[in-house]
Amino acid sequence: PRMAALSEIQWTEPSHKNFDSFLKRLPALLAIYRDRGYDFRQDIYDVNIDIVPAPDEGKARIAFQTFDDAEIHYTLDGSVPDVQSPLYTDTIQVDKDVIIQAIAVRPQGASQISKEEIHFNAATMRPVTLNTIPHKSYTFKGGSTLIDGLYGDMNYRSGRWIGFYGTDMNVTLDLLEPKEVSSVFVNTMLNTGDAIFGTTGLKVEVSEDGKNFRRVASEDFPVVEKGTKMQSRKDSVSFDKVKARYIKIIAEVTPKLPAWHSMPGEKAFLFVDEIGVE
């Protein structure tokens, strides 16, 4: 299908290029591929799972799509979906941990299973403000990336992470109402080869009005050591239980790349995919 898309781009006049039109014609082309026994990627048939935070409601909105509007069946409890599973008809809203699995059903059979997991904490699906700006190449969906309940893999270009270059991550969460909290975490990526280091400090401030903040926690973390394997790392701080509506989280970037690095003294990246409050 990618070869077909490339041909469409190459041979179509700019004024006539239309992705929706291409998708409508694609099923007939795929039928020819199958009839002639061509081997082609099957993931074009898979279900696309779109998860959008609804911060004012504290919920996630889940929508399923296929390129050809195929029938979709899904589960939210981690069980394997089949044609007896619920039929998708409209956007689904959730406010707790779910394991989403979905298949598209067509005359030739079911697609592969598409899967996503949403993990909730007190910060998940809540309004968030970025007080510092991510690097322009790694902003993606901005602050909502940090509270969407979706953890990233080791691909920092996937859109599941946002990256700060030589700048601390400073964000303010609105829990929408005062809640008792006693710990905060940030989940970061470690990939020293690409100058991506973890946080070296985590500070937490709380407020009732969103204007006057007081610090309730501050902890330092060592600079990542040479030879550290590529991984994600959850750094957290705990503090005496306090009631607050607004929480400011400051994750400090590694000040500069260490002497053992191939670019000693240069700025470091800080990549974060999720923040959490308990």
Language model segments and positions:
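Short, compositionally stereotyped local motifs that mark structural "simplifiers"
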Residues: 13, 17-172, 189, 198
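Conserved, mostly hydrophobic/aromatic
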Residues: 3
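Residues that form or immediately flank small-molecule/cofactor binding pockets and catalytic motifs
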Residues: 133, 209, 221
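Beta-strand-rich recognition/accessory modules
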Residues: 8-9
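Short proline/glycine- and polar residue-rich coil/turn motifs
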Residues: 94, 223-230
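Short, surface-exposed secondary-structure junctions/capping segments
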Residues: 129-138, 229-240
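Aromatic, loop-rich ligand-recognition surfaces of beta-strand-rich domains
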Residues: 154-217, 231-278
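Solvent-exposed serine/threonine-rich low-complexity stretches and specific carbohydrate-binding patches
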Residues: 215-225
